[in-house]
Amino acid sequence: MASVKNISPLAEKVAVTLTNFTGWLEKYGEVSWDHQSFFAGPVGRRAKALYYKNKLLGTAAVAPMIFFEAFLPSARRLFHHPIRLPIADAHFAMGFTFLHEAMANPAHLQKAVHFLAALEKTRCPDYLEFCWGYPFDWVTRNGVIKAGTPLITTTPYAFEAFLQVYKSQADAGRKKIIESIVRHTGTDIKDFKTSETARTSSYTPHDQGGVVNASAYRAFTLMSAAKFLGDNALLKIAEPNINFVLESQNADGSWPYAKDGVRDFVDHFHTCFVMKALAKIYKLNGDPRILAALAKGVDYYLKNLFAENGMPRPFSKAPRLTVYQCELYDCAECINLCLLLRREFPQLQSTLETVIAGILKNWVKRDGSFRSRKLMFGWDNVPMHRWAQSQMFRSLAFFLHEETLQA
């Protein structure tokens, strides 16, 4: 990777880390085990389904997986196989595009285009428009989401990836895919009235909504598309979703995972998802209501979702037993959020620097990849592209990109 002049010592270390990571990725490959590997195969799916039906019997059924997750993470290989994750490919595409923009190296853009080509092949096969989900059956408390079902928490990342690459290298085919993604987001994904001004987005084309970050994702995608495509009709679809997110904020500034009376936990990366989307929307429309909500959110975030060492805490209100102290995914999303909002909220700058320094000091393995989790005892060192090798790669590339702009 070419050097960048006049950047901070921290950015120089990040550049070296990114160089080493891209070398590791080339050797390791583009499929990996996953956070859900314990429960993606037939044994894990049956155990998890039983847990949701009968807590007593289900707890006994999932106990071996939870034990392995806490003490022997490499046991994932006993339950499933490495898979390709579209959400990871989207993050890799964005990360390599950031590197191209920072380094002006055509090879990075070629790599980004490569991951877009992978996304074209892994779209949900049963839908007319471009959309993406998981390549495994996902057992949830509300039933099984079958492999190939579009997820509004995945498709927006593909939208961002295609849009970012298009802005670096315009291509008519990519624009058509962007337009297709937008049609899917506006029509296949549904919304449901929650107040006179608000509507909640569905998570898939088949559910009744309620998950806060789902509405945030949909609103941002449609707002961004409205500007890119010059289609103000998309704003009318997005606005009620924005209102739902704003109305879902708790009095203390936090956001629950869902407004369904059940999943009211507050965790790190879902909080980041909501605030990231609001931050991007605010930069598009300057809505003062959003800035006010973000101010309350940032205050809660900094006071409740960090450990004493300055690294992210998984939960401020946990829904269940937590078998780890810190997660790579939380760190990656923290970096993204701080980069998006540090100008509006300068107090995030020190958080940004602390988390990046912590990652570089303790989370980078000798082979160039990242540790996945700091467990109660030891580390989960299994590389998982969705959880969150790709997200950390993108967030550090985003940081380097921003540093080169300042330089």
Predicted regions and their residues:
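Glycan-recognition and catalytic cores of secretory/periplasmic carbohydrate-active enzymes
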Residues: 1-407
